[in-house]
Regions:
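Conserved phosphate-binding/catalytic loop of the ribokinase/pfkB sugar-kinase fold
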Residues: 84, 94-132, 137
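A glycine-rich helix N-cap at a beta->alpha junction
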Residues: 71-86
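Structural alpha-helical scaffold elements that stabilize or flank donor/cofactor-binding regions
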Residues: 125-126, 173-174, 213
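Conserved beta-alpha-beta core of the PfkB/ribokinase-like small-molecule kinase fold
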Residues: 132-204, 227-229
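Conserved phosphate-binding/catalytic region of the ribokinase-like
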Residues: 3, 194, 198-278
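Glycine-rich phosphate/adenosyl-contacting loop at the front of the ribokinase-like
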Residues: 1-58, 63-67, 74, 92, ...
Length: 278
């Protein structure tokens, strides 16, 4: 069944200025509405390298919900376990500046509780033959528990990402059961109740190694934008992965693509976490 991706679907509404962006002022621009959501993005990214993932999630019982399913199927994602329910999709509204960076965003989360029943009814079918599991950690606690239970039952590795660290912080006890957790520098600061925004990669690497060891988290990767990424394992192994220079057009989904690549590498390729992060 390949990699199973579990999480929420969002509709992204994005605004781009036509001239110099004025914070707090009126800006003429253009608007885009696209399918989004961390896990949906991850499933599509994995499918784009021909790995045929399975997406487990919810969509609205509407034409927009069917559009999401149709697009995933066009990318060869297995959509058998997507359930149509009222309020099945969230909304993410973001404003971008002239550099392609998000200057402000607000999101409305969907009701993901129907996933609990879906996993209870079809969990064995979903997880028994999968290669690994990519999990959005800020789902309902019961959904995370169910996923980890099935992973243990069938001996599957679980890799986790977040879309809202404020919610995911309430799930931090589960991180000891996650084979690799990926987040950005700001999210890592929230997780460990500290401010890491000023840290350079060398210092971030040392701090992360200490935190991962003390919290007994098996493996963690922290992305740092243009500074690259750092990783650490509970056994003391850690390192820095320099960034590759690219022309930025839109940073939306960059972290999702990084996570998808990490999951693909850890699932399909027998190389170490440094080479995977590259």
């Amino acid at each position: 069944m390949g990699i199973v991706v579990i999480g929420a679907v969002f509709v992204d509404i994005k605004g781009y200025p036509l001239s110099t962006y004025i914070p707090g002022g009126r800006n003429a621009g253009r608007m885009e509405q696209v399918h989004g959501g961390v896990s949906r993005n991850v499933a599509e990214d994995i499918a784009n390298v021909e790995l045929r993932p399975t997406f487990v999630g919810l969509v609205d019982d509407s034409g927009m919900g069917q559009d999401v399913i149709d697009k995933l199927e066009n990318h060869k994602v297995n959509t058998r376990f997507i359930k149509k329910v009222p309020d099945g999709m969230g909304t993410w509204l973001a404003i971008f500046d002239n550099r392609g960076d998000v200057t402000a965003a607000i999101s409305k989360r969907p009701d993901t509780t129907p996933l609990i029943g879906l996993l209870a009814e079809q969990g064995d079918e979903i997880f028994a033959d999968c290669d690994s599991i990519a999990l959005e950690l800020d789902l309902e606690k019961e959904t995370v528990k169910q996923t980890l239970k099935y992973a243990k039952k069938y001996g599957k590795k679980v890799y986790a990402v977040v879309s809202n660290m404020s919610i995911a912080m309430e799930r931090r006890d589960f991180l000891q059961q996650i084979d690799c957790f990926v987040c950005n520098q700001q999210e890592a600061g929230l997780l460990f109740s500290d401010d890491y925004d000023h840290l350079e990669p060398e210092e971030m690497c040392r701090v992360l190694a200490g935190n991962v060891h003390s919290a007994n988290i098996p493996c963690m990767v922290v992305t740092m934008g243009g500074k690259g990424a750092v990783f650490a394992r509970a056994n003391g192994e850690c390192g820095i992965v320099p960034a590759k220079k690219v022309d930025v057009i839109d940073t939306t989904g960059a972290g999702d693509a990084f996570f998808a690549g990490t999951v693909i590498g850890l699932t399909s390729i027998d190389i170490d976490i440094y080479d995977i992060s590259k």
